[in-house]
């Protein structure tokens, strides 16, 4: 594991490091590695508690594999998995779809009424994110979770060139999960139950909620299993910063071979 000393590092060092990661993983950057690294450094504002890893088997991980799929190949995989979806149209999204059913018995949805949700842009996802969520749903199913309430997947960007493909929420490649509901109706709320602290470690040795309540431990177990399985390239939690106090940001990042957890 490579530990970043913080955003106080010179951006040039971070760029060189990111280039080395992409090279050793054999990943194809979406754009030039230097521009990509600079943008990601600004976007994620990496701090002392964040850690970025570049496993040698990155190409074999779900997130990296999904990030390299074409629209046709991705939709073919959805069909193969018997995932219900319809193709959508969405600016900046490479493979926009809308789910029409649960994933392994888990419903991913916003808080809106069904009539609103049917046309809500926030429920549009890039197909590649859906594949990662389908894997994530297997973890959730093992914890008796049947519903995930999220704030958004896609956020339509403003003043966007029609031929430009977005990342994160602009590209519908990230989900902000706020609440997890089990089959008994119990709600695990990230805001109230995660019990983290800004700058604290999220997963791995020495990482633990404080206090370590049963609900906090369940949330941590769910999240860290997803981290261990490399389902998402970027995982941000309440340990990251105040704007993430109430949700997990789960993101597939196309064209990279690294993983950022905070």
Walk through the language-model features, giving the residues of each.
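Catalytic cores and adjacent binding grooves of peptidoglycan-active enzymes
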Residues: 31, 42-50, 89, 94-100, ...
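Second-shell loop/turn segments in exported
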Residues: 59-65, 117-127, 163-164, 190, ...
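Mid-length scaffold segments of soluble, non-membrane domains
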Residues: 124-132, 136-148, 156-189
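An acidic- and aromatic-residue-enriched active-site/binding cleft used to recognize and process polar
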Residues: 145-153, 193, 255
